[in-house]
Amino acid sequence: MIERFTNASLKCPICNAPTALDGTKTLYCKGEKKHTYDISASGYINLASPKQCGGGDTKSAVKARSEFLDCGYYKPIADKIIELLMKYSNKSATVIDAGCGEGYYTTQIAKNVELAIGFDISKFAVEAAAKRAKREGIDNAEFCVASIFTMPIFNESADAVVNIFAPCVENEYFRVLKSGGILLVAHAGKEHLMGLKQTLYDSAYENDARADLPTDLELICEENLKYNIQVDKNANVMALFAMTPYYWRTSQNDAKKLDGLNSLKTEIDIIFSVYRKN
């Protein structure tokens, strides 16, 4: 598993030099100053710059989201991602999961491709992702703490980039994609989580169209996935709420409407947009 770090085209975030393994516990750069990066016991590596460290999801948020996703509510989303990757890329692909979080999607991608690389700015999320991969016996998924705005990987290193409910950084994705590579963006449709919003707000509203989708890549496919879920247990309801942007926009009075709510039926409405770098 550790050897995969040498196959991932990772570069030093400080001097941009190529990297190599020094034994099994350290990655070092081949630049003049030989910057070193320890590989954690969990199997991930921190390549975030000092200014970027400490950001992203908290440990408790990562734990709650992991438990929610492990219930299978979003399994159809993962299945659709794999379907589209296999249709527009191939099993020998190197795939970057930009904003990989706890690795729920990354590990499933890894089961179908040559190499999956997950980047996320939260060290708690990346640690959870690395532990998930170990737990599931996956040896072709590597995880790095790093910003998706400046990923520590060389130009044209990836056959595909997957962006799932994360900021869409077109210039950076264009840089790391090989010619002919694809970008797969999974984003909320108009009615996504409408049942949750109807519970929270007096006047529920449809989601706006996403404003940061690529303009310089060729759109080759767009598909819509819709289904309903019944979320059981208040902990799962609260975890779902915390995963959404509504969590940060909702007043305390409205948020209290979820207290003690042990069942929630809501819509899942996801748009999958596939772009190609020509």
Language-model features and meaning:
Residues 1-55:
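N-terminal auxiliary segments of SAM/dcSAM-dependent transferases
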Residues 170-182:
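A short glycine-rich, Lys/Arg-flanked "PGG" loop and its adjoining helix->strand segment in the class I
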Residues 149-160:
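A short acidic, Gly/Pro-enriched loop at the edge of an enzyme's catalytic core
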Residues 92-101:
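Conserved class I S-adenosyl-L-methionine
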